[in-house]
Amino acid sequence: MITREFDTIAAISTPLGEGAIGIVRLSGTDSFAIAQKIFKGKDLNKVASHTLNYGHIIDPLTGKVMDEVMVGAMKSPKTFTREDIIEINTHGGIAVTNEILQLAIREGARLAEPGEFTKRAFLNGRVDLTQAEAVMDIIRAKTDKAMNIAVKQLDGSLSDLINNIRQEILNTLAQVEVNIDYPEYDDVEEATTAVVREKTMEFEQLLTKLLRTARRGKILREGISTAIIGRPNVGKSSLLNNLLREDKAIVTDIAGTTRDVIEEYVNINGVPLKLIDTAGIRETDDIVEQIGVERSKKALKEADLVLLVLNASEPLTAQDRQLLEISQDTNRIILLNKTDLPETIETSKLPEDVIRISVLKNQNIDKIEERINNLFFENAGLVEQDATYLSNARHISLIEKAVESLQAVNQGLELGMPVDLLQVDLTRTWEILGEITGDAAPDELITQLFSQFCLGK
């Protein structure tokens, strides 16, 4: 296991650049001693914990005043890392925060690795692995709903569910041990078999129910992957720009001007819509455009939602019919663009629920948002306030494996296998669930997860 004997680390916890405040954070047993060497003000070793203290940062070698600061002094164990923490609040700016950080390092601190503060919180038992991952999700959340899921996970909703199941599995394993220790008692074996069957079915149902939230959780966390498709020059890029309320894609009358896949985010009902403006799908001899077309086809296959744009002022072409065919099994909304011009498209060959729009005149764009809302939110019941959602790919994969192990136990019971032979699968389920919370996670995984954090967190 990773050692719990830590040195004192330091890092800048605010974004680099100009700002009102910059924060240099220290964590470890020597935090107060290091800060006291460079801080002129109250004796930090004597101040009350969790207080802000006015003073100046001074280079002890030269006597140079670096900045006027407020120093937050927080004593263990009631801190984020459960170690002594010092937070030096400086005036924002690259130079001053860097110089103060270098002073702290010179006086005995070590530059923190990415995510090392949160890693220490995990290793010191302040948070488990799901809660540590929730910290990153809060930082990366693009909407309030994504943030709410992350906050709920940070609060321990997923941890509590997993830990309760693990405890129940341990209780069940204890009963199996009784069967192994006292095989001469047939009534004990029958009781144990009945308990194991009942409990494993209960565990499987709970985890399967949790897995059903994965699609909704992924949407709330990552957004609805939305491919805007159509033959060249039907208004795909104009639609993207309209939804974004800014010009991101090149808009011209020349077919093939979008040569690659453009991705941008827009909020619909508090959920991120990841808009993908694809290159027009058509046959072309242009090598660069061909690459864009292939990427467009890939985006179409992977999209949660497809916006198919057709030109209402022109008859359906072979390319239009091809797009209608290849997208018919997707979650699709058909948009008839350029309705400000005389309509010549054959609507009898289209589904009835098309939306007529004019991107140029900004007509009926709101109806697209209404349709998306109906597809994903109102009809699907996307958000339940008190529900626990799976949104992390690592969690989903592990719970799928846990369900498979439980199914193996249930199948063995159906075949009449003795419960003691099924102990291995039940124990494996307990171990897999422990990987989710970090109780049984390998050191390499922990290191890899925390390396994804930013410096200072």
From Swiss-Prot:
Detail which positions bind GTP: 233-238, 252-258, 277-280
Q: Which cofactor does it need?
A: K(+)
> InterPro entries from the xrefs?
G_TrmE (IPR031168), GTP-bd (IPR006073), GTP-bd_TrmE_N (IPR018948), GTPase_MnmE (IPR004520), MnmE_dom2 (IPR027368), MnmE_helical (IPR025867), P-loop_NTPase (IPR027417), Small_GTP-bd (IPR005225)
Cofactor remark? Binds 1 potassium ion per subunit.
A single Gene Ontology CC annotation of this entry is:
cytosol
List of residues binding (6S)-5-formyl-5,6,7,8-tetrahydrofolate: R25, E87, R126, K457
Question: Which Pfam families does UniProt cross-reference here?
Answer: MMR_HSR1 (PF01926), MnmE_helical (PF12631), TrmE_N (PF10396)
Q: Per the database record, which ranges form the TrmE-type G domain? A: 223-377
Gene3D superfamilies attached here? Answer: P-loop containing nucleotide triphosphate hydrolases, Probable tRNA modification gtpase trme, domain 1, tRNA modification GTPase MnmE domain 2
Tell me where on the tree of life, at the top rank, the source sits. Answer: Bacteria
Name of protein: tRNA modification GTPase MnmE
The top of its lineage is: Bacteria, Bacillati, Bacillota, Bacilli, Lactobacillales
